Amino acid sequence: MVDRWYNIAADLPSVLAPPRDPDEGESRIGLLSKILPSALIDQEFTAERWVSIPEEVREAYRRVGRPTPLFRAEGLEKALGTGVRIYYKYEGVLPVGSHKLNTALAQAYYAKADGAVEVATETGAGQWGMAVSLAAALFGLRAVVFMTRSSYNSKRQRLTFMRAYGAVVYPSPSDVTEAGRRHYRPDHPGSLGIAISEAVEYVLSGERRKYLPGSVMEFVLLHQTVIGLEAVRQLPEEPDVAVACVGGGSNFAGFTYPMIGMKLRGEGFGRTRFVAVESEAAPKLTRGEYKYDFPDAVGVLPMLKMYTLGHDYVPPAIHAAGLRYHGAAPSLSLLRKLGIVEAVAYPQEEVMRAALLFARTEGIVPAPESAHAIKAAVDLAKKLPRGSVIAFNLSGHGLLDSDAYEKFLG
């Protein structure tokens, strides 16, 4: 069992640009102390390479099934016939079916330690909402979730399970908050940016409430490194390419940052390329601009230096709702800017075809988000020399995404 998280800030070639307040209005940086557990603020700004995992969180990790397995994709390899070896780390074995639980448990623990009785958050496809709902229940907290309206209407199974774990779930934009009312109309698909604004406003409107972000913040990426730290121990050989999908960046960071850190320190993974895979519906790393922008739609949170499509960008409704986000985490954005991380974007149809190939060769129906990594792995396997090695993170299963598969299959 991993006993510490890895912080890539200690090994970055350039100093990470700090959060910044806008030129006008009240301080957003000062707001963080009102909405986040104090330990998470410390983790957001620390330059220490290693952060100890509290025993209570480690025990929670054990209870939910960490460490998660790493498999060789022999069926997929055979179907492709390229002579490339493919490995995948599988986070779908966790109770909520995705990697999101890794940071949800940590954040809920720190919220409880700060005296909170209620937590609020945003969710797209529902993986993060489910993770927060379960983590809150395990640590004796109430949970409120603002779910993008397109997913609220289509991902009904995840909505049901959030409620089963005890959460109150609102479709976003909602009429519960001013941020929601500003965008509200019945046919609005919502966006993660709007949902973040609603969750933050909700936390500020009551007592003993804390906000739990699902991605983008550096402490979220920190917690997810349990994935990559386990994978480094499990991989029988170093990959030529490591791949993961990107919404805000926590999944990609969780899988690759321990490897990137070793590469930057000269301790291994010297030949490994790192490929971030995004949806063409939200192509921040491939078509976005590197600048300071708000991580939420209304501008409640501090500005972050990141690749962004603009905080007012509303992506179209897609099957991979968890990738419908306008920006990428600051550390990931910096790595992309420096050329250490590559990026590629795919259209939905190609991704879903790769998902079906994986289901029929490996037996796991992947989440549409995770299928982006599969699509990239398949394409890479067709281009790399025989004997090459690919490793990717399968961040979740798609058993609660039957709506997406039903629509695609017709």
Curated annotation (Swiss-Prot):
**Which catalysed reactions does the entry list for this protein?**
(1S,2R)-1-C-(indol-3-yl)glycerol 3-phosphate + L-serine = D-glyceraldehyde 3-phosphate + L-tryptophan + H2O
Q: Molecular function terms in GO for this entry? A: L-serine hydro-lyase (adding indole, L-tryptophan-forming) activity; pyridoxal phosphate binding; tryptophan synthase activity
Q: Which cofactor does it need?
A: pyridoxal 5'-phosphate
- Record keyword Amino-acid biosynthesis present: yes
Q: What is any Pfam family matched here? A: PALP
EC number(s) recorded for this UniProt protein:
4.2.1.20
Recorded metabolic or biological pathway in which this protein acts: Amino-acid biosynthesis; L-tryptophan biosynthesis; L-tryptophan from chorismate: step 5/5
N6-(pyridoxal phosphate)lysine modified-residue sites: K100
- Keyword terms of this UniProt record: Amino-acid biosynthesis, Aromatic amino acid biosynthesis, Lyase, Pyridoxal phosphate, Tryptophan biosynthesis
Q: Which InterPro entries match?
A: Trp_synth_b-like (IPR006316), Trp_synth_b_CS (IPR006653), Trp_synth_beta (IPR006654), Trp_synth_beta/beta-like (IPR023026), TrpB-like_PALP (IPR001926), TrpB-like_PALP_sf (IPR036052)
User: What domain of life does the UniProt record list for this protein's source?
Assistant: Archaea
Keyword Lipid biosynthesis: yes or no?
no
Describe its partners and assembly state. Tetramer of two alpha and two beta chains.
What is this protein's function per UniProt? Answer: The beta subunit is responsible for the synthesis of L-tryptophan from indole and L-serine.
Q: Which family does it belong to?
A: Belongs to the TrpB family.
Any idea what this protein is called? Answer: Tryptophan synthase beta chain
Q: What organism is recorded for this protein?
A: Pyrobaculum aerophilum (strain ATCC 51768 / DSM 7523 / JCM 9630 / CIP 104966 / NBRC 100827 / IM2)
Lineage per the UniProt record? Archaea, Thermoproteota, Thermoprotei, Thermoproteales, Thermoproteaceae
Q: What gene is behind this protein?
A: trpB
